[in-house]
Amino acid sequence: MITIIGSGRVGTAAAVIMGLLKIDTKILLIDIIKGLPQGEALDMNHMSSILGLDVEYFGSNEYKDMEGSDLVIVTAGLPRKPGMTREQLLEANAKIVSEIGKEIKRYAPNSVVILTTNPLDAMTYVMWKSTGFPRERVIGFSGVLDAGRLAYYAAKKLGVSPASILPIVLGQHGESMFPVPSKSFIHGVPLSRLLTEEQLKEVVEETVKAGARITELRGFSSNWGPGAGLALMAEAVKRDTKRSLIASVVLQGEYDVRDVPVEVPVILGRSGVLKVLEIELSAEERQKFMQSVEAIRKLIASIPSNYLQ
């Protein structure tokens, strides 16, 4: 069974897409708002019936109902509002994530955890600490979304399908993240050879600012992109596809970084992160990567210690 904690826009989008992809036959929605997850589950069950899907949705306000889940997806947290940075969400969401982590440890101690709560990398650290799980089973979602956005904007410039691009985005899910055109390929040819310097600059800027742009346009943050990315990660875990994806994971010596969650390429399977892939970076790329790592370190250092137990 897959449990999704948080029945807002991202959680429900993920639930719908996972149902359409038939990733599991049982999907549980948990939320603190009475009636919300139950109503969403009922509506989704009607969808399943109409489409002939062998997927059943459940709604609950009780964490104990996640017992037996092998995958827990956490989308709960305060949303990012127009003009708000991810860092401003830090303390409030650290409290929420810490409390949820303890409940996951209690009721789903063998699960793989994927979370979307912002600021993402710092919240991945909070979840890792509060559950006490191995780093392989606590995964920050954002890299799939960032890589997908890079592929979209690069494809628009080149007039090709986004599916033909293998994108790499590293660092923090936030203002210091950086796409790596020299390591993003179309059939072995890097984007840095296919796009002009000006085009590359535009693609990178569009990728970094994509989330804020969506929020500016409609007044609330993205949900369909994150929902699709979560479904892709859930599929890798549930079906043990051993697929390479970009995800935020606590590094333990890779890239000469320790105890900091950072967006990097990983192999994802049934037990979570099976391998962290280390790609060769130029001196300039490594400098940007380490700047991103330091930005995450500063966020982690500002988290109250009582949320890290």
From Swiss-Prot:
Identify which residues the record assigns to the active site: 173
What is the catalytic activity of this protein? (S)-malate + NAD(+) = oxaloacetate + NADH + H(+)
Signal peptide from the UniProt entry = none
- Locate the transmembrane regions by residue number: none
Q: Does the keyword NAD apply?
A: yes
Temperature dependence is: Optimum temperature is above 92 degrees Celsius.
Where substrate binds, per the record, is at 80, 86, 118, 149
- Any one Pfam family match given in the protein's UniProt record, by short name: Ldh_1_C
UniProt-listed InterPro entries: L-lactate/malate_DH, Lactate/malate_DH_C, Lactate/malate_DH_N, Lactate_DH/Glyco_Ohase_4_C, Malate_DH_type3, NAD(P)-bd_dom_sf
Q: What is any one GO biological process for this UniProt entry?
A: lactate metabolic process
| Single GO MF annotation | L-lactate dehydrogenase activity
Gene3D superfamilies for the chain: Lactate dehydrogenase/glycoside hydrolase, family 4, C-terminal (3.90.110.10), NAD(P)-binding Rossmann-like Domain (3.40.50.720)
Q: What keyword terms does UniProt attach to this protein? A: NAD, Oxidoreductase, Tricarboxylic acid cycle
Highest taxon above the source species:
Archaea
Top EC class per UniProt?
Answer: oxidoreductase
Give residues annotated as binding NAD(+): 6-11, 31, 93, 116-118
Q: Write the Enzyme Commission number(s) for this entry.
A: 1.1.1.37
As for family, the record states: Belongs to the LDH/MDH superfamily.
Q: Give the function comment from the record.
A: Catalyzes the reversible oxidation of malate to oxaloacetate. Exhibits higher specific activity for oxaloacetate reduction than for malate oxidation in vitro. Has a strong preference for NAD. Can use NADPH for oxaloacetate reduction, but activity decreases more than 90%. No activity detected with NADP(+) and malate.
Q: How does it assemble?
A: Homotetramer.
- What name does UniProt use for this protein? Malate dehydrogenase
Q: Which organism is it from?
A: Pyrobaculum islandicum (strain DSM 4184 / JCM 9189 / GEO3)
Taxonomic lineage per UniProt?
Answer: Archaea, Thermoproteota, Thermoprotei, Thermoproteales, Thermoproteaceae
Gene name for this UniProt entry: mdh
